[in-house]
């Protein structure tokens, strides 16, 4: 996890000076969000985590900002995205479960490496997160699976 966080910091720190400027923050946020972030917005975001007041984020400040952002991500939005992903795999909206057959069907649609996936392999994938042993994944079981991924 720490190496992943360090990679994110390195990606934001374009000039490699060990600090993230408002300009670097702005550029990476625009790339990640797909929309422009103003210099003022980037500076305001940076200021919330700039504990030493130098106008830059060091690694520690950046990690704190990143953690705070993750905690503030609206639970409703996260839940909505999970529901959309679940619904792509679920058999029918009435039953709202992922069966081995619906998992196989969706994985085959996603790409050629899954074209030869056998039903038994799909059962095994579901079994790992099937908390109540009914052979299918409910939305709650899917949420647990995604949290562990």
UniProtKB/Swiss-Prot annotation:
InterPro entries: EF-hand-dom_pair, EF_Hand_1_Ca_BS, EF_hand_dom, EF_hand_pair_protein_CML-like
The keyword Calcium appears for this protein: yes
Residues that bind Ca(2+) 3: 130, 132, 134, 141
Residues at which Ca(2+) 1 binds: 13, 15, 17, 19, 24
Residues where Ca(2+) 2 binds: 50, 52, 54, 61
Function summary: Potential calcium sensor.
Official protein name in the record: Probable calcium-binding protein CML25/26
Gene source species: Oryza sativa subsp. japonica
């Amino acid at each position: 996890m720490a190496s992943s966080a360090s990679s994110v910091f390195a990606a934001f720190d374009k000039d490699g000076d060990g600090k993230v400027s408002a300009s670097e923050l702005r550029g990476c946020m625009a790339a990640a969000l797909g929309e422009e972030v103003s210099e003022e917005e980037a500076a305001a975001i940076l200021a919330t985590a700039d504990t030493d007041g130098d106008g830059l984020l060091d690694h520690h400040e950046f990690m704190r900002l990143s953690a705070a952002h993750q905690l503030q991500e609206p639970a409703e939005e996260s839940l909505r995205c999970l529901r959309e992903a679940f619904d792509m795999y679920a058999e029918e909206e009435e039953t709202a479960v992922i069966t081995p057959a619906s998992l196989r069907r969706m994985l085959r649609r996603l790409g050629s490496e899954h074209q030869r996936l056998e039903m038994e392999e799909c059962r095994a994938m579901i079994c790992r997160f099937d908390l109540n042993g009914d052979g299918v994944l409910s939305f709650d079981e899917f949420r647990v699976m995604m949290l562990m991924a």
